[in-house]
């Protein structure tokens, strides 16, 4: 999603680059963006910190077996936690899990004690934008119009690394917002071990109706050819061509904007006809790609649901009957509550803990309430990029504030998201045979969801990226 804000200051820009261990991730990104031949040479030339204590630039292959001994395990097969359990990791997979006395580790296993911590499956955010950064730093239009793609690629590398280090080991990235197919390159770089980051499912450009998204054309000279935040199409032939191009270039998901702010006063209205949406979904499904629909209005949601999309993003205008239909047809819902809070902070002077929730925040909370009432599958998708990467855990806190039990929110960000993303045979639970994506947080998040922000241990594919 896109709106308005103020140009960030140079001081803010410097803070974003220098914070934490971002410089190391920047060094990892520069060979990709600038053509440097040796990352190690670049590290030396820039006099960056040694690798000790940081996510490896090139993750090593998993070493000897690792036995993890936390205080408790939330395995995401239910809402229960298990005290006194242990988890054995061999290679990139979970080899055993259960009561510590029953988990027998090989003699050469490394034992890692995690006292006071709860071990969770790696967290998942099913609605992210790695190529965006908060709109109170740079307006969306300026990000698309003024930031070169190479610059945005470097930023995305930083965002990916920061996200992983905060326990989110998987993202569904729903559109590069003007950076073309660069998400496919980031995904490849992560998969091949060139840079640290979450495993990605990508949607490339997102499909939008002609003159409905932006930048412009309203407010700009009509003779200007403006870069676009999505792939603009009109009519069934162009819709089909866009789906085929995106699938061919590496999209795992097809994202469509079923409505957007193209009304006379800038209000959200439907952007595609029913026939166009039907054709888009049919072609995507024929290509084996599920479809994500941005939809905030009742009519936009209705058309997307009738077309058979797989997920609805935002859904703030959803009605009781629409959510009932979603439940009947197995269409999942990603509420993106944190983005609503961020918009309120940027544009409505909302101050967390001081002001009453805005009308938009109340509308989003009501939509979640209706979705829960109707038994809709609800995942955790935050729209991060609208707000700061690495703070994705805010979405779990909002899910709880707006009605979920803490354990429900944990399931949404693990097993449920994995199922929505069709990756539940690989990730999302702490079960023998699944990938060793594991995160440990201080305290018990089934009692206090806020502790998911206090990440102490991160493992992805059996590789430790963060240790106490």
Show the residue positions of the predicted features.
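Histidine-rich, glycine-flanked metal-binding segment
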Residues: 48-53, 58-64, 73, 79-120
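Acidic, glycine-enriched loop/beta-strand segments at the rims
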Residues: 54-58, 73-86, 99-100, 405-410, ...
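Metal-associated gating/positioning segment near the N- to mid-region
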Residues: 117-194, 210, 275, 299, ...
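Active-site gating loops and adjacent loop-to-helix segments of metal-dependent hydrolytic enzymes
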Residues: 131-152, 210-227, 263-270, 328-361
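Histidine/acidic-residue-rich catalytic or RNA/ligand-binding cores of hydrolases
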Residues: 134-136, 183, 212-213, 264-265, ...
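His/Asp/Glu-enriched, well-ordered alpha-helical/loop segment
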Residues: 142-144, 286, 290, 360-445
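Divalent metal-dependent hydrolysis catalytic cores, especially in the metallo-beta-lactamase
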Residues: 155-182, 197-206, 251-262, 290, ...
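Histidine/acidic residue-rich metal-binding segments in metalloenzymes
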Residues: 185, 238-332, 359-377
């Amino acid at each position: 999603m896109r709106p308005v804000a103020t140009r960030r200051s140079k001081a803010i820009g410097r803070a974003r680059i220098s914070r934490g261990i971002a410089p190391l991730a920047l060094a990892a990104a520069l060979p990709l963006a600038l053509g440097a031949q040796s990352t190690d040479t670049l590290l030396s030339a820039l006099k960056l910190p040694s690798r000790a204590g940081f996510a490896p630039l090139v993750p090593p292959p998993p070493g000897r077996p690792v036995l993890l001994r936390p205080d408790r395990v939330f395995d995401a097969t239910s809402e229960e936690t298990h005290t006194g359990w242990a988890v054995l990791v061999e290679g990139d997979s979970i080899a055993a899990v259960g009561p510590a006395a029953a988990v027998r580790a090989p003699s050469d296993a490394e034992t890692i004690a995690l006292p006071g911590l709860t071990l969770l499956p790696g967290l998942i955010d099913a609605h992210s934008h790695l190529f965006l950064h908060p709109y109170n730093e740079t307006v969306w239009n300026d990000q698309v119009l003024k930031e070169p793609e190479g610059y945005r690629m470097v930023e995305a590398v930083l965002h990916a690394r920061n996200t992983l280090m905060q326990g989110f080991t998987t993202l569904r990235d729903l559109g590069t917002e003007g950076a073309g197919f660069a998400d496919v390159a980031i995904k490849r770089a992560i998969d091949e071990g060139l840079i640290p980051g979450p495993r990605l499912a990508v949607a490339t450009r997102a499909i939008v109706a002609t003159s409905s998204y932006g930048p412009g054309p309203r407010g700009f000279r009509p003779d200007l050819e403006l870069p676009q935040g999505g792939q603009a199409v009109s009519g069934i032939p162009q819709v089909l061509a866009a789906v085929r191009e995106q699938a061919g270039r590496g999209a795992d998901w097809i994202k469509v904007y079923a409505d957007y702010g193209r009304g006379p006063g800038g209000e959200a209205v439907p952007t595609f006809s029913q026939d166009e949406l039907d054709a888009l979904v049919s072609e995507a499904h024929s290509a084996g790609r599920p479809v994500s629909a941005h939809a905030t209005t009742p009519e936009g949601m209705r058309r997307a649901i009738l077309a058979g999309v797989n997920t609805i993003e935002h859904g703030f205008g959803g009605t009781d009957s629409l959510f009932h239909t979603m439940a009947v047809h197995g269409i999942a819902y990603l509420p993106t509550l944190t983005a609503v809070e961020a918009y309120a902070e940027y544009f409505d002077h909302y101050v967390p803990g001081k002001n009453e929730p805005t009308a938009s925040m109340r509308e989003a909370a009501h939509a979640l309430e209706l979705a829960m009432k109707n038994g809709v599958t609800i995942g955790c998708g935050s729209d991060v990029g609208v707000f700061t990467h690495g703070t994705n855990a805010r979405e779990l806190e909002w899910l709880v504030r707006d009605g979920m039990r803490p354990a429900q929110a944990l399931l949404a960000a693990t097993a449920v998201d994995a199922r929505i993303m069709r990756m539940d045979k690989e990730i999302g639970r702490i079960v023998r045979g699944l990938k060793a994506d594991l995160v440990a947080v201080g305290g018990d998040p089934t009692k206090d969801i806020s502790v998911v922000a206090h990440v102490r241990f991160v493992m992805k594919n059996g590789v430790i990226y963060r240790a106490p």
